UniProtKB/Swiss-Prot annotation:
Superkingdom to which the source organism belongs: Eukaryota
InterPro entries xref list: CAT-like_dom_sf (IPR023213), Sec_Metabolite_Acyltrans (IPR051283), Tri101-like_N (IPR054710)
Assembly notes: Monomer.
GO molecular function terms listed in the Swiss-Prot or TrEMBL record: acyltransferase activity, transferring groups other than amino-acyl groups
Reactions performed catalytically: fumigaclavine B + acetyl-CoA = fumigaclavine A + CoA
Biotechnology: Ergot alkaloids are known for their toxic effects on humans who consume contaminated grains or livestock that graze on grasses harboring ergot alkaloid-producing fungi. Due to their strong affinity for monoamine neurotransmitter receptors they may also have clinical uses such as treatment of migraines, Parkinson's disease and cerebrovascular insufficiency.
UniProt EC number: 2.3.1.205
Entry's family note: Belongs to the fumigaclavine B O-acetyltransferase family.
Tagged with keyword Acyltransferase: yes
This protein's name: Fumigaclavine B O-acetyltransferase easN
Reported function: Fumigaclavine B O-acetyltransferase; part of the gene cluster that mediates the biosynthesis of fumiclavanine C, a fungal ergot alkaloid. DmaW catalyzes the first step of ergot alkaloid biosynthesis by condensing dimethylallyl diphosphate (DMAP) and tryptophan to form 4-dimethylallyl-L-tryptophan. The second step is catalyzed by the methyltransferase easF that methylates 4-dimethylallyl-L-tryptophan in the presence of S-adenosyl-L-methionine, resulting in the formation of 4-dimethylallyl-L-abrine.
Gene this chain is encoded by: easN
Induction: The expression of the ergot alkaloid synthesis cluster which leads to the synthesis of fumigaclavines is positively regulated by the brlA and stuA transcription factors.
């Protein structure tokens, strides 16, 4: 039996406490891989990863020795019952296959992303041991599905993507070689401590806004909903670029309009956008398309006209490195209502982009308006804002009651930057052909999946692979809508 690598307990950061206390699952599919050679390589790679980052084998528990604080969590060595659960579980499903991309039906002999393929449940109550992370290797009739389940209080999606990168390095490396990973347990503990230090957490005047953004919601296991479907879509990268170009041609006019009126919704010291990114435009397209589909089916009800978008803070806060594994994310709120300013149409009417026959002018104005507000919100999330957010979270007495607000009618999160398709796990395993993650069953959730650059080659941009959760009537209206249908490569499930 291997000797267990030990580590010192460390407290989770205030930002770690702001994420839902659930387990998230990411699955990689390797076609044609069986357990001959691949299982030992995978096990050796995981063992090597744990030896470099021993806290991955730990558990999340309450931390009782913090004065004037309750609900604080820490990572510590696993209890005896968790030590009996291997880091890599192995199961065989010789009659199951990975779902074909060309079918919308989930047949009985198809490997569904359900609990049997996962190493952990979706939710573990505080009364039971809560591991940091586990893997499960599912050997199917046509390949290997590797599922990683991780505690969202310890990692965000980017951090989990970094773990997969390091696992690939560990699996691919020669067993006798010296492997230099970008981080280790000591660095991770130090960085989480840094996020709680006075040098990072600095108060500012936006405490009221932070309080609204950090409203607490209870996390319970979600009941399965027969009325909500998660549907895959592929949107053309060329169409999104075309839309981006059209929106950017309108941007100077919108900036001039808002800077002239100085709407009460816009701060006086606004950092006006100079350019809209493809992600700004894609997010706006999703928001407008879903709004129109809900409107067409009478599903809007009393929903607010706002969206929440997850924002990775790693590159916005010095000196946090790209490879930091912990949670470092917040949300930006944006109104996606139709433009109310009557002068807008007159101002931009002469702009050639408004006369593209394939894009309705009103839709283009609406999308540009929302993309402008998205970029405006992102520009406001600077280092001062982030330090103020961390100060607000740290100043709360009950850390169990803090949380980033993720309950808007539309919530959009992008993992397009994750390199899962580029990872080489070495001989007998190779590169993943497909990646999937459970996006839950919350109405209005949109997840942009990692870009499959290997499928299109180096000369082309990968299409935007998206999962959208809506009720079936709204989904059908979304597919039938002119602007969304124009952007689609195809419905990725048919």
């Amino acid at each position: 039996m291997k000797k267990q690598v030990t580590f010192k307990p460390f407290r989770l950061s205030p930002v770690d406490h702001s994420l839902p206390k659930v387990y998230i699952f990411k699955s990689l599919y390797f076609r044609g891989v069986d357990d001959t050679g691949s299982l030992s390589r995978l096990q050796d790679g995981i063992d090597r990863l744990i030896s470099c980052l021993p806290f991955l084998s730990g558990e999340v528990v309450p931390c009782a020795d913090i004065p004037d604080k309750v609900g604080v969590l820490q990572v510590q060595m696993p209890c005896p019952s968790l030590q009996e659960i291997p880091m890599l579980l192995v199961k065989s499903y010789p009659n199951h296959t990975w779902p074909a991309a060309s079918t919308s039906e989930r047949w009985r002999n198809t490997a569904l992303l359900d609990q049997s393929y996962r190493p952990l449940p979706d939710f573990i109550p505080p009364s039971k041991p809560r591991p940091v992370l586990r893997f499960q290797a599912n050997f199917l009739a046509d390949g290997l599905m590797l599922c990683m389940g991780y505690n969202h209080s310890v990692f965000d999606g980017t951090g989990a993507g970094n773990i997969l990168e390091m696992l690939a390095d560990c699996c691919r490396a020669n067993p006798n070689s010296i492997l230099a990973l970008p981080t280790n347990g000591d660095i991770e503990s130090e960085l989480r401590g840094l996020l709680s230090s006075p040098g990072v957490a600095v108060a500012n005047a936006s405490q009221e806004a932070y309080a609204i953004n950090c409203a607490h919601t209870e996390v319970e296991p979600e009941p399965s909903s027969a009325m909500l479907y998660c549907w895959p879509f592929l949107l053309s990268s060329e169409k999104i670029e075309c839309l981006q170009e059209a929106c950017n041609s309108l941007l100077p006019h919108i900036v001039r309009l808002y800077s002239g009126t100085q709407s009460s919704l816009i701060n006086q010291d606004t950092n006006w956008p100079h350019i809209l990114s493809s992600n700004d435009v894609l997010t706006a397209l999703l928001a407008v398309s879903i709004e129109k589909a809900r409107e067409a089916t009478g599903a809007l009800g009393h929903m607010s006209r706002s969206l929440a978008m997850a924002v990775n803070l790693r590159e916005r806060l010095k000196p946090m490195p790209r490879h930091y594994l912990g949670n470092l994310v917040t949300t930006v709120w944006v109104s996606h209502h139709r433009p109310a300013v009557k002068d807008l149409e007159t101002m931009v009417l002469p702009v050639p982009a408004c006369n593209r026959h394939e894009i309705d002018r009103d839709d283009l104005l609406w999308i540009t308006h929302v993309a402008f507000r998205i970029r405006l919100g992102l520009n406001a999330i600077n280092e001062e804002h982030i330090r103020g957010l961390i100060h607000y979270l740290h100043s709360q007495d009950d850390w169990e009651q803090i949380g980033i607000h993720f309950t808007d009618p539309i919530f959009i999160s992008s993992w397009r930057h994750l390199k899962v398709y580029e990872l080489d796990f070495g001989p007998t395993i190779g590169h993943a052909e497909h990646f999937e993650m459970d996006v839950g069953t919350t109405d209005g959730v949109c997840v942009v999946m990692p870009a499959n650059t290997r499928a299109v080659g180096k000369t082309k941009k990968a299409p935007w692979d998206i999962r959208i959760v809506l009720n079936p009537e709204v989904l059908q209206a979304l597919i039938a809508s002119a602007i969304f249908g124009w952007a689609m490569v195809k419905d990725a499930s048919t």
